Every structure is written in C-alpha cells, then in structure tokens.
C-alpha cells in the first residue's frame, strides 16, 4: 500500500476563481526536476483534495503535482449565488492551468472530476499534455436519445420533475446522505476492497457537507441544465492530447458494458485503456496500481 500524504487541516487560499478563494495543494520533487510538464488532480462530486492522499506523495517524486478543491467542495467556499454546473468546474480547471501552472499539464480526474478534466483539456489545447480519466461521469450523445420505452421515459421525467421541485424532499435526502453511517455504506458499495474506507476518508466527505451552502451544491444534481455538460463524443473530437482510461472494472455506477462500448467507439486514436480490479475510485482503492500506470503512461509519451 502506498504511504498516504499527511494532508493538513489548514487551508491554502493562494488562488482565486470568480473572486472566491480556492483551496489548493502543490507538491514538487525534493530534487529539481527537468520535467517540462505538471500533473493536476481533480476530485469527484462530494470529495476533495483529501481523496488524493495516496497519489500526491508518489506522483510528486517525479513531477510537480497540483490538486484543487472545486468550488462548492472540500475546503473551498460553497457560495449560494453560484450556478453549479459542469461548465463552471470545467472553467475552474482550465483557468487554474492557465493562471497558476502555466505549462503543459496532465489532468487526472475521477467521476465528476473526470468530466471537468476532459472538458478543460479539450479547451486548453497545447496546455493539455494528456488526460487520465478514472471512471469519469458524463454521457454520450447516443445515451441522451436512448431507446427507452415511452413508459420508462414518462416515469423518469415525472420522478425528476417531482424531485427537482421538492426542496423538502431534496433536503431530507441530503441530510440522510451526509450521516457518517450512510457515507460509509455508500463508499463500501463502490469500493470492491473496503480496506481504505477508513475514518479519514469518511470525515473528508462529511466535514465539507456540514459547511453553509453545501446543500445548494447538492441540489445542483437535480438541475437538468446544471451538472450535465457537453457529450463525451463531442469533447473527444476537440481533444488534441493523449488519453488514458483507467477503469475500476467493478464500478456499479459508471462502468457498464454499453458505456465501455461507447468509449471504444468515440475515444480518439491516441487512447490507452486499462481495466483494474477496483470500484468507482481506483486511485484510492488501488493507488499503487493507478500511480504506476499513470507514471508509465506519461513516460511512454
């Protein structure tokens, strides 16, 4: 098992986005490196920079490594006057690369962070050295016009409309989901090996959910024009840098057979795919494998 980084409880507000202070972490090799690129780590929905505890120490042995808390998550602010969306987080990632890193960057993202990483990389062009998707969240155009029956579509539309307009029900779900016992249960469901589902991980998710404004971020998942962004197939057409797909093959959420087929159909030619014996968060469940695959892939380019 990789040795975890001792992530401080203190915040590092060294950079602002939309006039909000953003918590960031930067780690560099102890000895001066000749590497001309950097690595940026982007967490998923409800997570934070803490989720890279096993990755930052290893990757930063060779490369300059950055990790940021997306606006609305972790130690970053959770303003109530912001429209939370994939577009917002894509802009945050791209802006950080342009304003802070200022050199070609390998952007690594898990779940929602995977989508933000891909979308930002497609926009960054020459500042994108490559993209690593760890069970990324997002949709393809074909999925948005799927062949569901009329009844299925009607039930889905009714449920989404009812839930979207019912703040009381949303709040009830939110309060239930942020209980420690339920956070642990959810993590156990998406980690094939639960050895790393520890108090540190649970607290890293629960503490930010207690911040004022956290409920407004959670509500964004019910906004039909919110979290979902541009389809993957369109983003792949814009991407000019190499792509590494690191799949946790036992992910109950993202790694469906139909989804994998769509990746194979639309992913650019310069794509490598690796299937790992893990769940939705392979970087935290099997970090030694993820770290090695990332480093080997970068070295091979």
Please name every model-derived segment.
Residues 11, 15-20, 27-31, 66-108, ...:
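Active-site loop/oxyanion-hole signature of alpha/beta-hydrolase fold enzymes
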Residues 26-75:
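Conserved HGGG/HGGXW glycine-rich cap/lid loop of the alpha/beta-hydrolase fold
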Residues 47-57, 75-78, 116, 141-142, ...:
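Short N-terminal helix/helix-N-cap motif within the alpha/beta-hydrolase-1
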Residues 114-125, 131:
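Short glycine-enriched nucleophile-adjacent loop
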Residues 122, 131-171:
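Flexible "cap/lid" loop of the alpha/beta hydrolase fold
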Residues 170-237:
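Conserved alpha/beta-hydrolase catalytic His-Asp/Glu region
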Residues 238-278:
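Conserved loop-alpha-helix segment in the C-terminal half of the alpha/beta-hydrolase fold
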Residues 269-301:
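Catalytic active-site module of serine/aspartate enzymes centered on a nucleophile-bearing elbow/loop
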């Amino acid at each position: 098992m990789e040795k975890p980084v001792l992530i401080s409880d203190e915040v590092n507000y060294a950079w602002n986005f939309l006039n909000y202070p953003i918590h960031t972490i930067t780690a560099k090799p102890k000895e001066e490196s000749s590497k001309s690129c950097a690595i940026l780590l982007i967490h998923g929905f409800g997570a934070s920079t803490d989720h890279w505890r096993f990755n930052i120490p290893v990757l930063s042995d060779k490369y300059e490594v950055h990790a940021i808390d997306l606006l609305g998550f972790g130690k970053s602010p959770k303003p109530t006057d912001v429209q939370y969306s994939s577009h917002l987080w894509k802009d945050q990632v791209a802006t950080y690369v342009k304003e802070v890193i200022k050199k070609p960057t390998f952007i690594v993202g898990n779940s929602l962070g995977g989508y933000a990483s891909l979308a930002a990389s497609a926009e960054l062009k020459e500042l994108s050295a490559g993209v690593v998707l760890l069970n990324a969240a997002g949709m393809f155009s074909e999925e948005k016009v799927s062949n569901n029956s009329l009844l299925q579509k009607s039930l889905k539309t009714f449920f989404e409309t009812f839930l979207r307009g019912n703040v009381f029900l949303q709040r009830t779900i939110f309060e239930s989901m942020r209980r420690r016992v339920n956070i642990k249960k959810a993590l156990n469901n998406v980690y094939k090996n639960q050895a790393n589902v520890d108090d540190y991980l649970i607290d890293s998710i629960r503490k930010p959910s207690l911040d004022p404004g956290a409920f407004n971020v959670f509500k964004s998942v019910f906004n039909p024009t919110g979290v979902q962004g541009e389809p993957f197939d369109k983003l792949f057409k814009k991407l000019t840098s190499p792509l590494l797909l690191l799949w946790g093959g036992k992910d109950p959420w993202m790694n469906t057979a139909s989804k994998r087929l769509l990746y194979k159909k639309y992913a650019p030619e310069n794509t490598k795919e690796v299937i790992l014996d893990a769940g939705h968060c392979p970087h935290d469940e099997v970090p030694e494998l993820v770290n090695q695959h990332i480093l080997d892939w970068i070295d091979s380019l």
